[in-house]
Amino acid sequence: MVAARARRRKRASVTQLYSTCKAAGTCPPDVIPKVKGTTLADKILQWSGLGIFLGGLGIGTGSGTGGRTGYIPLGGGGRPGVVDIAPARPPIIIEPVAPTEPSIVNLVEDSSIINSGSTIPTFTGTDGFEITSSSTTTPAVLDITPSAGTVHVTSTNIENPLYIEPPFIEAPQSGEVSGHIFTSTPTSGTHGYEEIPMEVFASNVTTGKEPISSTPTPGVRRIAAPRLYSRAFSQVKVTNPDFISKPSTFVTFDNPAFEPADTSLSFEEPTDVAPDPDFLDIIKLHRPALTSRRGTVRFSRLGQKATIRTRSGKQIGARGHYYHDISSIAPAEELEMQPLLSPSTNNYSYDIYADLNEAETGFMQPTQTTPMLRSPFSPLSTQLPSLSSSVSSSYANVTIPFSTTYNVPIHTGPDVVLPTSPTVWPFIPHTSIDTQHAIVIQGGDYYFVAVYIFVTQTP
């Protein structure tokens, strides 16, 4: 039978052996070098550390404490940084309290200096205080009136030599003397100031041309007409006149009790077929508009359809222009204009008219002889041919002569045509000397041609 082997006990550590065997001097030979770090491995590290730096890794036979400097964390430098250490506060001294002393500690130390305050006055007399009284008859009133000084009174008189009014009788009025002199009632004298006419800015009388705003803008601002006939709107003509008064009956079968005619109409998502197929899927009808196009008065509304509905709830659809022609505008009638006066028989450009009632006595002589043409420079004389003028008194067209310097007869021009005119030049119309006639001249341009005849004098 094999005897049981005794259990091996663990040897004590080097530090424990060194603390017990150092005093007795019985330390094993391998304990003291390990404690003092003089083993062969320690010496090799010391010799190699003279040439290389191992970073304080603590390689040796001692405990793994990282050597004298300890372990360095990864990512740090080779040497630890300088750490600022704040000065330490002085420790608080705890004083014990005896059982017989109170537990309340005074925060303020007792002072040995006692302040007794101000000194108490001492009275030596025995009569006490002396009371005196005084009386006066002057009231305690402060004089706030300033000291008297000189007062300068000035007056201003303005005269305008360019405009002087007639003097008015005014009497002087007293009691109104200040820096300027004014008169409140008409008194004797003449105005000493200039009267400026006042202009009325605000008046109840309006002319219709006043601006309606404080800063009127010149010109006329025109409101842009709705673009109902663009490509964005489909044109739908509605022939039923109920579209003007009851537009909702074309979308739904329900007829509301009150339906405003000038507002937009909104409808819920249609579930049934619309009464009118043109209004299918209509969800909104905008407010109406009256326009005139191509000779008609047109009632229009814009309609919004909801044909497609997205997942987000947005409705997409086309827009249409629904219109109904109310009435046609007839063209303006052309009225034939009738003349108010009968057409005149005289179509001449230049005519001279005389009063027929007074002209009857002036045209009774049948003939007229042409006078002699004499020149003041020559004794010669020239006899012009004698022509007859048979102008009837029933005609109103009479040509009158104009006087000339050398008694030259005046003949009719191409613009004046007589009823019975001779073809031989010249023609001298008959004039009446004793009868005055009222003459009316109608025309625009008159030309006076002076005819001069010069006769040479022979020696």
Swiss-Prot record:
Keywords for the protein's UniProt record, in alphabetical order: Capsid protein, Cytoplasmic inwards viral transport, Disulfide bond, DNA-binding, Host endosome, Host Golgi apparatus, Host nucleus, Host-virus interaction, Late protein, Microtubular inwards viral transport, Phosphoprotein, Viral penetration into host nucleus, Virion, Virus entry into host cell
GO CC annotation: host cell; host cell endosome; host cell Golgi apparatus; host cell nucleus; viral capsid
Any one Gene Ontology molecular-function term assigned to this protein's record: DNA binding
Pfam family, one: Late_protein_L2
Post-translational modification: Highly phosphorylated.
Any single biological process term in GO: viral penetration into host nucleus
Disulfides per UniProt: C21-C27
UniProt subcellular location: Virion; Host nucleus; Host early endosome; Host Golgi apparatus
UniProt motif (Nuclear localization signal) ranges: 1-12, 454-458
Entry's family note: Belongs to the papillomaviridae L2 protein family.
Known role: Minor protein of the capsid that localizes along the inner surface of the virion, within the central cavities beneath the L1 pentamers. Plays a role in capsid stabilization through interaction with the major capsid protein L1. Once the virion enters the host cell, L2 escorts the genomic DNA into the nucleus by promoting escape from the endosomal compartments and traffic through the host Golgi network.
Subunit structure and binding partners: Interacts with major capsid protein L1. Interacts with E2; this interaction inhibits E2 transcriptional activity but not the DNA replication function E2. Interacts with host GADD45GIP1. Interacts with host HSPA8; this interaction is required for L2 nuclear translocation. Interacts with host importins KPNB2 and KPNB3. Forms a complex with importin alpha2-beta1 heterodimers via interaction with the importin alpha2 adapter. Interacts with host DYNLT1; this interaction is essential for virus intracellular transport during entry.
Protein name: Minor capsid protein L2
Gene transcribed to yield this protein: L2
